[in-house]
């Protein structure tokens, strides 16, 4: 019986659900950099999340980025493995979880000789990702979803980040 009671006091969103939602952001594309010096068209793919595992209250994202780079050295294609970290924040008005304070914590680029150019572009990539995720929710509660999800949208008091999940409590 306890499980039934628990259902009414909170709603849990798993990493898998966040990942399915993030898949909708696959192919985030943006032009970044300093035109004429070093700039790139970047496309993000394969975003996956780890919730509260590496660092309490943070979401770690990993993903791939395809880059078409132009620099003083000419045009070049490169691929990156990205690791991002963000703070999940609940927006009650929108009934959505946003990933704020997004930052690139690790980036490896292939071919390796592009690493220097990538270091130049990293602050621009950071800013572009931060702006994007400040506006695009990582997860939106649906009123037409499950009963728990509809209740979460109405009664949510905030969020708690636990390893592997985000819990939305309905009570203080």
Residue ranges of each PLM-predicted region?
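Extracellular/lumenal and peripheral-membrane lipid-interaction modules
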Residues: 5-172
